[in-house]
From Swiss-Prot:
Its cofactor is [4Fe-4S] cluster. Belongs to the DPH1/DPH2 family. DPH1 subfamily. PANTHER family: 2-(3-AMINO-3-CARBOXYPROPYL)HISTIDINE SYNTHASE SUBUNIT 1, DIPHTHAMIDE BIOSYNTHESIS PROTEIN. Residues 1-74 are annotated as: Disordered. Its main location: cytoplasm. This is 2-(3-amino-3-carboxypropyl)histidine synthase subunit 1. The gene is dph1. InterPro entries: DPH1/DPH2 (IPR016435), DPH1/DPH2_1 (IPR042263), DPH1/DPH2_2 (IPR042264), DPH1/DPH2_3 (IPR042265), DPH1/DPH2_euk_archaea (IPR035435). It holds the Pfam family Diphthamide_syn. Its EC number is 2.5.1.108. Pathway: Protein modification; peptidyl-diphthamide biosynthesis. GO terms for biological process: protein histidyl modification to diphthamide.
Length: 445
């Protein structure tokens, strides 16, 4: 449920501008071992043999210049034609066109796959035209399959289509670039917003001294971090929580940090829609949640039917306990399905002598599963929110991997194991979305 709150006309406010260069990650200092230092010392002709003693101070050779491989050169950054082409795109959306052009040129990619979420497909053809114009000899391919989130990165299809590089827009690096099957470039698409209105609205609705936990999608992550010092100067205490390995402040629809209700007064979500916020609300049922929509510039109080959701999921788990035959669905939409999680559940079923069937699906619909009526329980390794949000619409129980392990007696129920809080940690470091091969052996005979 959404309850709008008082807005503000956003009076003029002095806000310090933060240089974009301050947000750039600085290169880590390289550790120089003793063996390397000795080698440099021997090559330095300016150091005489008299000075090379255990107690003498030796002059260290100057560090080499930093690597420039990933730095966009001025001839691309300052190219007036490229800048003119970028003007065709919204000014407050950072599609990082110069960075993409540089990556295509330096990698020598000849066929580039572009993957967008539904909301950004409107800009796909424009970006495609810009890249092909400034990267002669390069062909672009727009991937049209639905992209729900960071888990849907489709490097397998891009590789099958003969692409050399995949550019994935508007999601974080949930699947690391050293794991993807082809070279991958993540573009977060930072979105700039008018923060003065947000600050004025918060000041009008909340008393100074409140502790606010700020979260959002990756597009607004830079804004969240920029807001922290401004809100603190206004008298608020600001916490930007993290659930590793996600970035600080970033949440997904299936993964969000669990906060202490005694330390946090307000959970503030920056973004449009409720899908991601609901993850944080499920994981923090006692903390009041608010959503600021930067497009409509409204602040609303958000609520969630925790009791109803818990009752539906308990009923599905209890029904699954008596199922004679199970079905295991491995999601094939991008990287949604984890084969190791599937193997782990298979091992537990085999250990208990429960027959099962495996099914590979890109999208899961009730009608598809209803045609296999002999299967009395399904567990889907794709998106936990599909079961949580839509499980009631399926003719048989549709469990998440976590719920399946509860039904099989492998894990404790959230009522006893997590103080009644349903966990939202699917892509956390030890979450079931990241099951490793050795963990898949659990339950094996």
């Amino acid at each position: 449920m959404t309850e709008p709150l008082l807005s503000s006309a956003a009076p003029e406010m002095k806000m310090e501008e933060t240089s974009s260069s301050s947000n750039l990650r600085q290169p880590k200092k390289r550790f120089v071992g003793r063996r390397t230092a000795d080698a440099h010392a021997q090559k330095d002709a300016s150091i005489s043999s008299k000075d090379v003693e255990s107690t003498s101070v030796q002059r260290v050779a100057p560090r080499r210049n930093p690597r420039t491989l990933n730095q966009v050169p001025p001839e691309i950054l300052d190219d007036p034609e490229i800048q003119a082409a970028i003007e065709l795109l919204p000014k407050n959306y950072s599609f990082e066109i110069p960075k993409t052009i540089h990556r295509i040129r330096t990698s020598g990619a000849k066929r580039v796959a572009l993957q967008f979420p539904e909301g950004l497909l409107i800009f796909a053809t424009t970006i495609s035209d810009i890249l092909t114009q400034f990267c002669p000899g390069t062909e672009t391919l727009i991937m049209g399959d639905v992209t729900y989130g960071a888990c849907c990165i489709d490097d397998y299809t891009a590789r099958a289509l003969g692409c050399d590089l995949l550019v994935h827009y508007a999601h974080s690096c949930l699947i690391p670039v050293d794991v993807t099957q082809i070279k991958t470039l993540y573009i977060f698409v930072d979105i700039s917003i008018d923060t003065s209105h947000l600050i004025a609205t918060l000041e009008r609705n909340f008393q100074p001294g409140k502790t606010i936990a700020t979260v959002g999608t990756i597009q607004f992550n830079a804004t969240l971090h920029g807001l922290k010092p401004v809100l603190e100067r206004a008298g608020f205490k600001v916490v930007i929580p993290q659930i590793a390995p996600l970035s600080k402040g970033e949440i997904l629809g299936c993964t969000s940090p669990q906060l202490s209700p005694t330390e946090i007064d307000i959970l503030l979500y920056l973004g449009d829609g409720r899908f991601h916020l609901e993850s944080a609300m499920i994981h923090n049922p006692t903390i009041p949640a608010y959503r600021y929509d930067p497009y409509s510039r409204t602040l609303s109080r958000e609520t969630y039917s925790h009791d109803e959701m818990h009752a539906l999921r308990r009923d599905a788990i209890n029904t699954a306990k008596s199922a004679k035959k199970w079905g295991i669905i491995l999601g094939s939409l991008g990287r949604q399905g984890n084969p190791n999680t599937m193997a782990m559940i298979e091992n537990h079923l085999n250990e208990r002598g429960i027959p099962f069937v495996n099914l590979l699906l890109s999208e899961i619909f009730p009608g598809k599963l209803a045609s296999m009526s002999d299967v009395e329980c399904w567990v889907q390794i794709a998106c936990p929110r599909l079961s949580i949000d839509w499980g009631y619409a399926f003719p048989r129980p549709l469990l998440t991997p976590y719920e399946a392990l509860i039904a099989l007696g492998v894990r404790e129920h959230w009522d006893s194991a997590n103080s009644g809080v349903y966990p939202m940690d699917f892509y956390a470091k030890e979450g079931l979305g990241r099951t490793k091969p050795q963990q898949a052996l659990q339950g094996a005979a």
